[in-house]
Amino acid sequence: MSDKTVKVQLVKSLIGTRETHRATVRGLGLRRLNSVSELQDTPAVRGMINKVSYLVKVIS
Protein backbone atom coordinates (compact mmCIF):
# COMPACT_ATOMS: atom_id res chain seq x y z
CA MET A 1 0.00 0.00 0.00
CA SER A 2 1.03 3.59 -0.40
CA ASP A 3 2.41 5.53 2.55
CA LYS A 4 0.95 8.79 1.24
CA THR A 5 -2.10 10.27 2.89
CA VAL A 6 -4.65 12.86 1.89
CA LYS A 7 -6.68 15.11 4.20
CA VAL A 8 -10.24 15.99 3.23
CA GLN A 9 -12.63 18.46 4.86
CA LEU A 10 -16.42 18.59 4.57
CA VAL A 11 -17.20 22.18 3.52
CA LYS A 12 -20.84 21.95 2.39
CA SER A 13 -23.90 20.59 4.17
CA LEU A 14 -25.34 17.21 3.24
CA ILE A 15 -28.93 18.50 3.41
CA GLY A 16 -30.64 17.98 0.06
CA THR A 17 -27.92 15.78 -1.41
CA ARG A 18 -28.38 12.28 -2.80
CA GLU A 19 -28.36 9.36 -0.42
CA THR A 20 -25.45 7.75 -2.29
CA HIS A 21 -23.39 10.92 -1.90
CA ARG A 22 -24.17 11.02 1.82
CA ALA A 23 -23.01 7.42 2.12
CA THR A 24 -19.81 8.28 0.24
CA VAL A 25 -19.07 11.17 2.61
CA ARG A 26 -19.62 8.85 5.58
CA GLY A 27 -17.29 6.34 3.94
CA LEU A 28 -14.64 9.05 3.86
CA GLY A 29 -15.01 9.35 7.64
CA LEU A 30 -16.64 12.78 7.61
CA ARG A 31 -19.55 13.54 9.93
CA ARG A 32 -20.06 17.22 10.67
CA LEU A 33 -19.46 20.36 8.65
CA ASN A 34 -15.76 21.31 8.67
CA SER A 35 -14.74 17.88 9.98
CA VAL A 36 -11.37 16.64 8.70
CA SER A 37 -10.34 13.08 7.91
CA GLU A 38 -6.90 11.76 6.96
CA LEU A 39 -7.02 8.82 4.56
CA GLN A 40 -4.67 6.63 2.53
CA ASP A 41 -4.08 8.05 -0.95
CA THR A 42 -5.50 5.19 -3.03
CA PRO A 43 -7.44 5.16 -6.32
CA ALA A 44 -10.60 4.12 -4.43
CA VAL A 45 -10.37 7.09 -2.06
CA ARG A 46 -9.58 9.43 -4.96
CA GLY A 47 -12.71 8.19 -6.74
CA MET A 48 -14.82 8.82 -3.66
CA ILE A 49 -13.42 12.35 -3.35
CA ASN A 50 -14.10 12.96 -7.04
CA LYS A 51 -17.71 11.77 -6.65
CA VAL A 52 -18.47 14.29 -3.89
CA SER A 53 -16.02 17.00 -4.96
CA TYR A 54 -18.72 19.67 -4.61
CA LEU A 55 -19.04 18.85 -0.90
CA VAL A 56 -15.42 18.35 0.18
CA LYS A 57 -12.09 20.15 -0.04
CA VAL A 58 -8.70 18.43 -0.21
CA ILE A 59 -6.42 20.08 2.35
CA SER A 60 -3.17 18.25 1.63
From Swiss-Prot:
Cited InterPro entries: Ribo_uL30_ferredoxin-like_sf, Ribosomal_uL30_bac-type, Ribosomal_uL30_ferredoxin-like
A single GO molecular function term of this UniProt record: structural constituent of ribosome
One Pfam family in the UniProt entry: Ribosomal_L30
Domain of life per record: Bacteria
Organism: Paraburkholderia xenovorans (strain LB400)
Subunit structure: Part of the 50S ribosomal subunit.
Secretion signal span: none
Official protein name in the record: Large ribosomal subunit protein uL30
Keywords: Ribonucleoprotein, Ribosomal protein
